[in-house]
């Protein structure tokens, strides 16, 4: 069972690597690998937690209504409880 999981993981990783190498070889840009890695690991401003106004737990974030103890989820635009992984 473990060997099958490991072989499937290695097969999948090999296919992903093959895709990346083929795509990079077709690209005419010399800086492609660097650009690709920077785009994969770049943090977009949309994913950063923002302090916004909110109306209450699991409610849509509003600009005019404020509530303490909640933060606005950047993904769903709902008011949620603050947690360490959301900071």
From Swiss-Prot:
<keyword id="KW-0800">Toxin</keyword>
<keyword id="KW-1015">Disulfide bond</keyword>
<feature type="signal peptide">
    <location>
        <begin position="1"/>
        <end position="24"/>
    </location>
</feature>
<dbReference type="InterPro" id="IPR011696">
    <property type="entry name" value="Huwentoxin-1"/>
</dbReference>
<keyword id="KW-0732">Signal</keyword>
<feature type="propeptide">
    <location>
        <begin position="25"/>
        <end position="52"/>
    </location>
</feature>
<protein>
    <recommendedName>
        <fullName>U3-theraphotoxin-Hhn1o</fullName>
    </recommendedName>
</protein>
<dbReference type="GO" id="GO:0090729">
    <property type="term" value="F:toxin activity"/>
</dbReference>
<comment type="similarity">
    <text>Belongs to the neurotoxin 10 (Hwtx-1) family. 51 (Hntx-8) subfamily. Hntx-8 sub-subfamily.</text>
</comment>
<keyword id="KW-0872">Ion channel impairing toxin</keyword>
<comment type="function">
    <text>Ion channel inhibitor.</text>
</comment>
<feature type="disulfide bond">
    <location>
        <begin position="61"/>
        <end position="72"/>
    </location>
</feature>
<keyword id="KW-0964">Secreted</keyword>
<keyword id="KW-0960">Knottin</keyword>
<feature type="disulfide bond">
    <location>
        <begin position="54"/>
        <end position="67"/>
    </location>
</feature>
<dbReference type="Pfam" id="PF07740">
    <property type="entry name" value="Toxin_12"/>
</dbReference>
<dbReference type="GO" id="GO:0005576">
    <property type="term" value="C:extracellular region"/>
</dbReference>
<dbReference type="GO" id="GO:0008200">
    <property type="term" value="F:ion channel inhibitor activity"/>
</dbReference>
């Amino acid at each position: 069972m473990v060997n099958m999981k490991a072989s499937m993981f290695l097969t999948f990783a090999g296919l992903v690597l093959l895709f990346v190498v083929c795509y990079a070889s077709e690209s005419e840009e010399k800086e492609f690998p660097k650009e690709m890695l920077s785009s994969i690991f770049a943090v977009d401003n949309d994913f950063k937690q923002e302090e916004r106004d909110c109306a209450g737990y699991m409610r849509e974030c509003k600009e005019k209504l404020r509530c303490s103890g909640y933060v606005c989820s950047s993904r769903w635009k709902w008011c949620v409880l603050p947690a360490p992984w959301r900071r």
